[in-house]
Amino acid sequence: AALLLLALGLLMVASASMPIAARQTGQPFYFLIRQGAFALIGLLAAGFIFQIPLTRWQRGGPVLLLAAIGLLVIVLAPGVGKEVNGSMRWIGVGPINIQVSELAKLFTLIYIASYLQRHGEELRVANFRTSALALLRPMVVLAVLAVLLLLEPDFGSVVVLMATALGMVFLAGVNLWQFSALLTGTTATMAVLILSSPYRRERLFSFLDPWKDAFGSGFQLVQSLIA
């Protein structure tokens, strides 16, 4: 399925970029070739990562969490992070720029998965205090990561991280009442963050009704619907 999606993506890149590539570079397949090279690098990296046993990922969860926090702190340091459109999300490494929030999300979710596996019994016990304390620890970690992401700011990564983590917590078999309270609190917090920011409010309303400003805030969504 992943390879099929990759092939479909390359096909769409070729279809959408040929006129622009021909006009700008004289090579109609310029962007396709470049994207294909990136895809090949990604496949080679995926093949290498697949060889690492799951037990190593589990043992390395705490280290990866510290790496995630470190990256999100470093990118905010003056002279280290690169500001793009008002957000400090990138670190330059030679000829490439790395969006540290993507690595941080991956590392954090590996840690959460490791934690849920190690403390699954505590999360599922009937004793409220024991299960609540077991659930509180990863939630504190997620809160710290969310604050660092919001300082960039990168609200979209916060939403993806929290939604994925909540899904993992639910699948781990946590008490339904505790999960409902956690879900309600998280949703309320997200709503406050959206409504308190004009930019986030505009993005939400543009998503709900992109045709209202088809050549402004809703341009990308409208073009994707047309395509």
Residue map of PLM features:
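Membrane-helix boundary/helix-loop-helix interface segments in multi-pass membrane proteins
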Residues: A1-L5, L11-P153, L221
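A short hydrophobic/aromatic micro-motif that marks alpha-helical segments and, especially, helix-coil
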Residues: Q24, A68, S114, G120, ...
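Short, surface-exposed helix-loop/turn micro-motifs enriched in polar/charged residues
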Residues: E83, N127, V158-V159, S196
